[in-house]
Amino acid sequence: MNAVTEGRKVLLEIADLKVHFEIKDGKQWFWQPPKTLKAVDGVTLRLYEGETLGVVGESGCGKSTFARAIIGLVKATDGHVAWLGKELLGMKPDEWRAVRSDIQMIFQDPLASLNPRMTIGEIIAEPLRTYHPKMSRQEVRERVKAMMLKVGLLPNLINRYPHEFSGGQCQRIGIARALILEPKLIICDEPVSALDVSIQAQVVNLLQQLQREMGLSLIFIAHDLAVVKHISDRVLVMYLGHAVELGTYDEVYHNPLHPYTRALMSAVPIPDPDLEKNKTIQLLEGELPSPINPPSGCVFRTRCPIAGPECAKTRPVLEGSFRHSVSCLKVDPL
């Protein structure tokens, strides 16, 4: 346990989560079995009340699919996802309805996630009208205005349309829509990657402020390692659908154990120009393997500088302590 999670209850428990897609191309005969794309392949973790979990990894590693599988937007192939002790996988649509008021999502492209034919007042109010149909129009409007103020939008903009706002403002609208039901968990799927750097900082600071005020837990997915370090309590590193390292942000950033994590962290820019000039970047050789035909054993072994013969035979699993665990046969997690 760390200071953030000590004494707090487990909100989300994920065990051996897998998301596989069947792929059949035009070169296959109809009687041939389809190929399998392993987008997420056996991720296990716990998320605690009030915690922010950062998820990092290169494009195509399964970050977004992992997040969408949690909330049921993508169907999981196998594994377990429990919310407050209740199994989510296999739930019926009417059962999901109650859970989704507790778990909301903020999407990557702020403008594309908003209906262009609806005013922002209607967009933010839509979850309220869905879950509280008996709420009066006046009460809905007042709650929408209060939420707009909370995310930094002026209430007099309530009747405007999404195209009249900047990217940062559209993301604030998306945040307001996600928070209007007062959920316990927000899944942020690369919420700042489409924004300018200055706007990114504003959105991240807003999320942290709202987390303190509302007692939220966050799953924050991003490419920008500096942003993830700034906002996260713990960090999950993914590679080709696998969890390769998990730990507190301090351990993962300052004492990375997995060769892939070391390469990632070596690419983070250092503000001091003298240190930046003299640092060594660990370059990975070879191409990223296909998730349709991943390597046997450790999926990172084809690009790993310390891989041995045993890495082709045995698939490693996360081992270590709560503060720091790693999935590597060549590294001692303790």
Curated annotation (Swiss-Prot):
One of its GO terms (cellular component) is ATP-binding cassette (ABC) transporter complex, substrate-binding subunit-containing. It comes from the Bacteria. It is a peripheral membrane protein. The keyword Protein transport applies. Keywords: ATP-binding, Cell inner membrane, Cell membrane, Membrane, Nucleotide-binding, Peptide transport, Protein transport, Translocase, Transport. It holds the Pfam family oligo_HPY. It catalyses: a [peptide](out) + ATP + H2O = a [peptide](in) + ADP + phosphate + H(+); L-alanyl-gamma-D-glutamyl-meso-2,6-diaminopimelate(out) + ATP + H2O = L-alanyl-gamma-D-glutamyl-meso-2,6-diaminopimelate(in) + ADP + phosphate + H(+). SUPFAM superfamilies: P-loop containing nucleoside triphosphate hydrolases. Residues 12-265 form the ABC transporter domain. NCBIfam families: oligo_HPY, PRK15079.1. Belongs to the ABC transporter superfamily. This is Oligopeptide transport ATP-binding protein OppF. It comes from Escherichia coli (strain K12).
